Each structure stands twice: as C-alpha cells, then as structure tokens.
C-alpha cells in the first residue's frame, strides 16, 4: 500500500504529487484498470503474446 506522510512545512499539493508518483510506480492504477472488466483467458493470452512480440518497446 502506498503511504505518504506530510512533512513539516510541506504543502498538500506536493504530498498529493508524491502519492500519485508512488501509486504510478507501484502499478496500482494499471492493476485497477485491468481488473475493471473480465478478460477471457483466450484474449489474455493473445494480449500477452502481442506484448511479447513487441518486446516491451515504448
């Protein structure tokens, strides 16, 4: 779980920015989006094969 403690003289905005970065780095948002809808196993295999073919390029 991502946790951010507010430091002395730190604004709420900067703490929120740090929190968002931690969530992004942990992959929590992408996991939530992935689990929003059911994905059939055949489609999951197809997506993984496509990602492997691309080789993780940007």
Swiss-Prot record:
Feature: compositional bias, Basic and acidic residues: 49-58
A GO term from the CC aspect: ribosome
Pfam families: Ribosomal_S21 (PF01165)
Keyword Ribonucleoprotein: yes
PROSITE patterns: RIBOSOMAL_S21
Region (Disordered): 38-58
Keywords, sorted A to Z: Ribonucleoprotein, Ribosomal protein
This protein's record includes keyword Transport: no
Coiled coil stretches, renumbered: none
Gene3D superfamilies reported in the protein's UniProt record: Ribosomal protein S8
Domain of life of the native organism: Bacteria
GO biological process: translation
GO terms, molecular function: structural constituent of ribosome
Recorded family membership: Belongs to the bacterial ribosomal protein bS21 family.
Protein name in the entry: Small ribosomal subunit protein bS21C
Protein encoded by which gene: rpsU3
């Amino acid at each position: 779980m991502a946790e951010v403690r507010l430091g002395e003289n730190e604004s709420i905005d900067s703490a929120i920015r740090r929190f968002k970065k931690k969530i992004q780095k942990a992959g929590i948002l992408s996991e939530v989006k992935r689990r929003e809808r059911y994905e059939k196993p055949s489609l999951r295999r197809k997506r993984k094969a496509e990602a492997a073919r691309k080789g993780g390029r940007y």
